[in-house]
Amino acid sequence: MTAFIKKLLSPVVELRDSEVGTSLMMFSYSFLVMTAYTALKPVTRSKFIADMSAENLPLVQFAFGLVVGFLMQGYSAIVGRLPRRWAMPITLGGLAAMLVGFWLWFQSGSQWASTGFYFFGLILGILVISQFWTLANEVYDPRQAKRIFGFIGGGSSLGGIAGSYLTLQAKAIGTTNLLLVSAALIGLCLMLVSAIIGRERPEIKGSLTGGEDEGVGAGEALKLLKSSRHLQTIAMIIGFAAIGAAIIEQQLNMATAASKGAGNTDSITSFLGQVQLYTSIIGFVIQVWLTSKIQRYLGIGFALMILPTSLGLTGTLMLINGALWVPGLARVLDTSLRYTIDKTTREILFLPLPNDLKQQVKPFVDVTVDRFSKGIGALIVLVLINKTWGLGLGWQQLSWASLGMTGLWILAALRARREYRAIFRKSLDQQVVEPQSLRLSDADLSTVETLVEEQGHPNPRHVVYAIDMLESLDKRHLISPLLLSHDSPDVRARALATFLLVGVSNQPA
């Protein structure tokens, strides 16, 4: 049976006999937990809109940004008292029980149930994703991770599609009953995780909260951020992405409430699920077929421009056309691009930084700056739409804020492109990037072009370093055969080793 499964999966992933069972369970875990989460996400919005109105969503989002750190610290304190290996199964059991509890609360007709459930949904999104990858990093060593992570992570993509499809059935199932469906799915995850832990017996050392496992404190991270203009630019880009997403999400929520009727919960759930389904499918297609090609052939500068350009174009379209499909399209494009092309491109921006600096400040920039910016985005939206003390703008008029954000974002992207090239060139001179730390996704056009040019450097040490880097990026075909005739014996030896490795040792000397 194991041999059959290996052969069946061979076009997708290369598995050893001992890895088949655990990898299938990890794939199933990622699929089920993401199905449960994505099925609930539209429900959190639709229930809140029905009970508290779409205009109050930014208020609860801003409040969540203020308290999320305290909530996660409280959770960490609780699970810290539990046996580390069993913290995940106990957490999953608690989440399933809370979903049943919220289902019962909704039966009482309390409006506050919607607010509590919205908070719960935001926390759930943090926990389920971080816990899955924490377990994956403990089960697999780095060599296994390179082979297997793409496969088990694929379960999340399929789960996003399956969960979104579930929400399309809200009218048949009932919006509130989707909580019971998700509780059952999380119950299955509990059994899978228990089986994986019993089989592999991993030592769970990573964070269970999606927080900053590594790096320095916030104060020290801010000092490092102030000392690096490039880091400041990365933080600005992350901030603009979060604020732009907050504006688009609010436009979609307000437009849906106006079109479907704020009290029509099942219709709102179904429509938001439809938007989420398109987002999952298009995001999957972009990640698999477009992301690497855009970075490889068009470069990091072009990739950085895609998301702000999308924000500006859809913002303009919303000013012209008030149909519901327009904010739906804006949300699909924003989310699918943000978590594919834009996210991987931002990762490349960190590439030329020294590893110690990267490890110290990257968690702060990725997590804290993003959460802070989401809070700022919610506050901006609140000021723009509040009819009592704010500007009282409608959902279409919010696009003026998007257009202003687009201009600032494009300026930051142009600056990031210039700084990246300068810092990457400097990092080559100082050789601060470890070739073995590179990933294939780091191979954007600008990076590869610079490394190819580096083969002509008069210093042999630089040439050898460029060969190491190209080899790590799986770009051996770009290593010049002329290096076999280089004046330096070190360069000749390194080039020969590479050509022998790829079976072209007959290159002319």
Mark where each language-model region is.
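Intracellular loop-helix junctions on the cytosolic face of multi-pass helical membrane proteins
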Residues: 1-24, 54-58, 81-86, 93-96, ...
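Amphipathic alpha-helical scaffolding segments comprising HEAT/armadillo-like alpha-solenoid repeats
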Residues: 445-454, 473-485, 504-509
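Substrate-agnostic recognition of the 12-TM MFS/MFS-like secondary transporter fold
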Residues: 22-75, 113-168, 213-224, 229, ...
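Short inter-helical turns and helix N-cap capping residues of alpha-solenoid HEAT/ARM repeat scaffolds
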Residues: 456-459, 486-490
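C-terminal transmembrane helical hairpin of 12-TM major facilitator-type secondary transporters
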Residues: 302-341
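Structural detector for internal amphipathic alpha-helices that build alpha-solenoid repeat scaffolds
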Residues: 435-441, 461-472, 481, 492-504
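C-terminal ends and interior cores of transmembrane alpha-helices
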Residues: 93-111, 291, 307-323
